[in-house]
């Protein structure tokens, strides 16, 4: 344990000497496999995953990361059992309410945005989302985006449809359509920037339709640990890999 801490501190000092990514996105994979490994129920795996998200938030803000996007629930996840979906939505609501009560949300000026097709979510969760977004909308120092009922291809399709509606109404001319306009019609409404580093836990090496527009030129980092077992060392290694890639880019 002591050698682990020594290595972590050495790695932290090394990472702090370099640039820190502005926007990190994380695919939090492995909650259910973690639960199976530990002989737990799936909802217990999701609970431990939510506690890990709290921890990682603090690590990121302390390192100087300004924006964090967490993939909490995809549109494909609606295929899961009603019991598991209910547990996940209850956990999401609980975590959002915790953020509302947490003094660090206000000390750090954390703005919270939920991105995805929220009309697919339970009404009580939608109301909580609305409340946390309203209460934090003036915060500008740190940004947390939570992707819920999210699909990357659908996000782009919805943005295109929204622009086409404006074209039909005469509000936009076709020749005015550009990348900036499309970004302004994505779920984040232009408020979340391009992703610098995307991390996936759980051993899978794919991005699963997560932020295809925003992460087009990002560095992807895959690690084998299940999300509830993700360590600060793993985060620091991911940032170090990003720093290495950035320093070796061909201009």
UniProtKB/Swiss-Prot annotation:
Against CDD domains, the record matches this protein to:
Cis_IPPS (cd00475)
Cofactor names = Mg(2+)
Q: Which reaction(s) are listed as its catalytic activity? A: geranylgeranyl diphosphate + 7 isopentenyl diphosphate = tri-trans,hepta-cis-undecaprenyl diphosphate + 7 diphosphate
Q: Does the record's keyword annotation contain Transferase?
A: yes
Q: Which residues bind Mg(2+)?
A: 29
The answer to keyword Lipid metabolism applying to this record is: no
Q: Which GO terms describe its biological process?
A: polyprenol biosynthetic process
Record: active site: 29, 77 (proton acceptor)
Record-linked PROSITE patterns: UPP_SYNTHASE (PS01066)
Entry EC number(s): 2.5.1.89
Q: Which UniProt keywords apply?
A: Magnesium, Metal-binding, Transferase
Binding annotation for substrate:
30-34, 46, 74-76, 78, 80, 200, 206-208
Q: Which Pfam families match?
A: Prenyltransf
Q: What does the UniProt cofactor note say? A: Binds 2 magnesium ions per subunit.
Q: Which InterPro entries match?
A: UPP_synth-like, UPP_synth-like_CS, UPP_synth-like_sf
Question: Domain of life of the organism in this record?
Answer: Archaea
According to the UniProt entry, its GO molecular function terms are: ditrans,polycis-polyprenyl diphosphate synthase [(2E,6E)-farnesyl diphosphate specific] activity; magnesium ion binding
UniProt cross-references to PANTHER family, sorted A to Z:
DEHYDRODOLICHYL DIPHOSPHATE SYNTHASE COMPLEX SUBUNIT DHDDS, DEHYDRODOLICHYL DIPHOSPHATE SYNTHASE FAMILY MEMBER
What is this protein's function? Catalyzes the sequential condensation of isopentenyl diphosphate (IPP) with geranylgeranyl diphosphate (GGPP) to yield (2Z,6Z,10Z,14Z,18Z,22Z,26Z,30E,34E,38E)-undecaprenyl diphosphate (tritrans,heptacis-UPP). It is probably the precursor of glycosyl carrier lipids.
Assembly and interaction partners: Homodimer.
In terms of HAMAP family, this protein maps to:
ISPT
Q: Which family does it belong to?
A: Belongs to the UPP synthase family.
Please state what the protein is called.
Tritrans,polycis-undecaprenyl-diphosphate synthase (geranylgeranyl-diphosphate specific)
- Look up and give the organism this protein is from: Archaeoglobus fulgidus (strain ATCC 49558 / DSM 4304 / JCM 9628 / NBRC 100126 / VC-16)
